[in-house]
């Protein structure tokens, strides 16, 4: 048996174990949501402090919970995580706009950034595993409307970072043109007069893509790379902003897209 055949045989032999490890990791993740709902939510309600302090505490709990999940999937050999320019992710009150190749990249990002908020699907508020953490941490549902800008600007002013995927959904595996990008991130940056930090995420091989099932594992562990790119200064778009807010938002959104997808 040659080296290639031996490697293929080893992959097939390890597949049942990798499936079991994956099921364990996601069960642990779901259990964290239940624990948050049944134990931490009542405790947060009884704890003293302002609503902002309670949200901050909840986010620290979520950060540790997500960090535990990341440690589990990396220790089990399911995923490898690489972070480029890690010091950038430690900056307070940053707007981090990323592409979205995998389901778990948001989990990784929220475990890296000291304190962050994000926008989530409103449907997740109906999910037993995710409702309590979302409400406790004050994450904003995507049906919040114009109020979201006001809430996010207030969070940024308190030093809370904002993690967002301008595509609004996971990045397709095959891209022949620039994906459609929502302008909300640019609108927030222009309103708050804050730069946008593009975060280019690469995933090889791709796993947990849109409409894919978790048990369809790639042959090799997925390598997730998070690269913080140079900031995009909104002052560059100030002249356009003074003439047309909408056009400035479009141009800024396009600039973010070019940074995230330079090959398109």
What do these predicted regions represent?
Residues 81-99, 129, 151-156, 196:
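Alpha-helical membrane-embedding segments
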Residues 2-94:
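Membrane-anchoring hydrophobic helices of lipid-metabolizing enzymes
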Residues 73-74, 134, 155, 189:
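A generic structural signal for well-ordered alpha-helical segments
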Residues 2-5, 9-12, 149-264:
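Non-catalytic C-terminal accessory region of glycerolipid acyltransferases
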Residues 80, 115-116, 140, 159, ...:
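Secondary-structure boundary/capping positions in well-ordered alpha/beta enzyme cores
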Residues 75-83, 142-146, 208-211:
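Short gly/ser/thr-rich secondary-structure transition/capping motifs
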Residues 84, 120-121, 166:
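Thr-Gly-centered strand-to-loop micro-motif
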Residues 41-67, 76, 90-145:
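Catalytic core of membrane glycerolipid acyltransferases/transacylases, capturing the structured
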């Amino acid at each position: 048996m040659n080296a290639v055949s031996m490697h293929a045989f080893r992959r097939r032999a390890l597949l049942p174990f990798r499936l079991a490890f994956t099921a364990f990791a996601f069960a642990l993740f779901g259990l964290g949501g239940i624990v948050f709902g049944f134990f931490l939510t009542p405790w947060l309600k009884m704890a003293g402090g302002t609503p902002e302090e309670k949200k901050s505490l909840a986010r620290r709990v979520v950060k540790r919970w997500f960090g535990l999940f990341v440690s589990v999937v990396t220790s089990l050999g399911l995923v490898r995580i690489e972070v480029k320019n890690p010091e950038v992710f430690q900056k307070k009150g940053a707007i981090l706009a990323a592409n979205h190749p995998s389901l778990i990249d948001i989990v990784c990002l929220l475990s890296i950034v000291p304190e962050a908020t994000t926008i989530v699907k409103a449907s997740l508020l109906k999910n037993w595993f995710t409702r309590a953490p979302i409400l406790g941490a004050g994450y904003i549902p995507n049906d919040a409307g114009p109020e979201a800008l006001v809430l996010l600007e207030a969070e940024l002013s308190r030093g809370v970072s904002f993690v967002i995927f301008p595509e609004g959904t996971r990045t397709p595996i095959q891209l022949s043109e620039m994906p459609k990008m929502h302008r909300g991130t640019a609108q927030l940056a222009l309103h708050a007069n804050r730069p946008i930090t593009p975060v280019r995420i690469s995933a090889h091989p791709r796993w947990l893509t849109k409409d894919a099932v978790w048990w369809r594992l790639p042959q090799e562990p997925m390598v997730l790379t998070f690269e913080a790119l140079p900031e995009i200064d909104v002052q560059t778009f100030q002249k356009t902003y003074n003439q047309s807010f909408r056009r400035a938002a479009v141009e800024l959104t396009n600039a973010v897209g070019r940074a995230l997808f330079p090959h398109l």
